[in-house]
């Protein structure tokens, strides 16, 4: 299992949200580049980055920071937030993003997912952000009537190999992941599943590893010192 430390960008700074609420934003670091360098020093092999401004506006807002980070940190990153067209995907892959994450666009534009998969195969992941079992879109502001399992099956059927699952009600809470929802997802699809939202300590990491989950995205637990990143990475590699 791999540990992906998380950087959420808002107005150029690293922030954390609470349950996806943009009115409950906490700045956790001024510099995304310095934060990423710290993650790399701790042994991170991959970093998860979300452009929250982009997710809200439907277009990349913090791409200059992403570009700088790729040049200075030299570590694989997966990036999502505001990716709505193939031109943006082409640009991100071109500047060195290792994996792009489609969220809202995946639900609203299946044709885009198919084209992205055709061009970039497993460099494309679909982020499924769910609340009460239903997929949320537009920066988590709107809840669809699409069940998260049905959506995951659909994405797998068109060639998606990587699914990032977030339970919005757990995000930023340090209450632990939604293990039941993750297990149900794992029982229904064969994609690589990355768990996100609520991971609070190394016990959660151990349990996810027991579930044979592909990856764990850890954010608030690192910034609040609940998890020692070096320790979590060593644990995940055992």
Swiss-Prot record:
Entry keywords, A to Z: Amino-acid biosynthesis, Cytoplasm, Histidine biosynthesis, Isomerase
Q: Say which domain of life the source belongs to.
A: Bacteria
User: Has UniProt tagged this entry with the keyword Cytoplasm?
Assistant: yes
Reaction catalyzed? 1-(5-phospho-beta-D-ribosyl)-5-[(5-phospho-beta-D-ribosylamino)methylideneamino]imidazole-4-carboxamide = 5-[(5-phospho-1-deoxy-D-ribulos-1-ylimino)methylamino]-1-(5-phospho-beta-D-ribosyl)imidazole-4-carboxamide
Q: What class of enzyme is it?
A: isomerase
Q: Could you tell me which InterPro entries the record lists for this protein? A: Aldolase_TIM (IPR013785), His_biosynth (IPR006062), HisA_bact_arch (IPR006063), Isoase_HisA-like (IPR044524), Isoase_HisA-like_bact (IPR023016), RibuloseP-bd_barrel (IPR011060)
Where in or outside the cell it occurs: the entry states: Cytoplasm
Q: Name one Pfam family in it.
A: His_biosynth
Output one GO BP term.
Answer: L-tryptophan biosynthetic process
Active site, UniProt feature: 8 (proton acceptor), 129 (proton donor)
Signal sequence, start to end:
none
Q: Does the keyword tRNA-binding apply?
A: no
Q: Which SUPFAM superfamilies match?
A: Ribulose-phoshate binding barrel
A GO MF annotation of the entry reads: 1-(5-phosphoribosyl)-5-[(5-phosphoribosylamino)methylideneamino]imidazole-4-carboxamide isomerase activity
The pathway where this protein functions is: Amino-acid biosynthesis; L-histidine biosynthesis; L-histidine from 5-phospho-alpha-D-ribose 1-diphosphate: step 4/9
The enzyme's E.C. designation: 5.3.1.16
Query: What's the family?
Result: Belongs to the HisA/HisF family.
The protein's name is 1-(5-phosphoribosyl)-5-[(5-phosphoribosylamino)methylideneamino] imidazole-4-carboxamide isomerase
- Lineage from the top down? Bacteria, Bacillati, Bacillota, Clostridia, Eubacteriales
């Amino acid at each position: 299992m791999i540990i992906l430390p998380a950087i959420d960008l808002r107005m150029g700074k690293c922030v954390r949200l609470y349950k996806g609420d943009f009115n409950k934003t906490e700045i956790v670091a001024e510099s995304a580049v310095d934060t990423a360098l710290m993650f790399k020093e701790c042994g991170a092999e991959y970093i998860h980055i979300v452009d929250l401004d982009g997710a809200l506006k439907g277009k990349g807002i913090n791409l200059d920071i992403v570009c700088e980070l790729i040049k200075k940190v030299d570590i694989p990153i997966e990036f999502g937030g505001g990716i709505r067209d193939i031109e943006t995907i082409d640009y991100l892959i071109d500047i060195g993003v290792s994996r792009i994450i489609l969220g809202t666009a995946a639900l609203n534009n299946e044709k885009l997912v198919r084209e992205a998969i055709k061009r970039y195969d497993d460099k494309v992941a679909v982020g499924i952000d769910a609340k009460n079992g239903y997929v949320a879109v537009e920066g988590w502001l709107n809840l669809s009537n699409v069940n998260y399992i049905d959506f995951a099956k659909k994405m797998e059927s068109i060639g998606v190999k990587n699914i990032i699952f977030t339970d919005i009600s757990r995000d930023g809470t340090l209450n632990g992941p939604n293990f039941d929802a993750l297990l149900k997802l794992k029982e229904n699809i064969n994609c690589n599943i990355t768990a996100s939202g609520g991971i609070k300590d190394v016990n959660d990491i151990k349990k996810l590893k027991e579930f044979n989950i592909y990856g764990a995205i850890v954010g608030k637990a690192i910034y609040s010192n609940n998890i020692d990143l070096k320790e979590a990475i060593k644990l995940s590699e055992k």
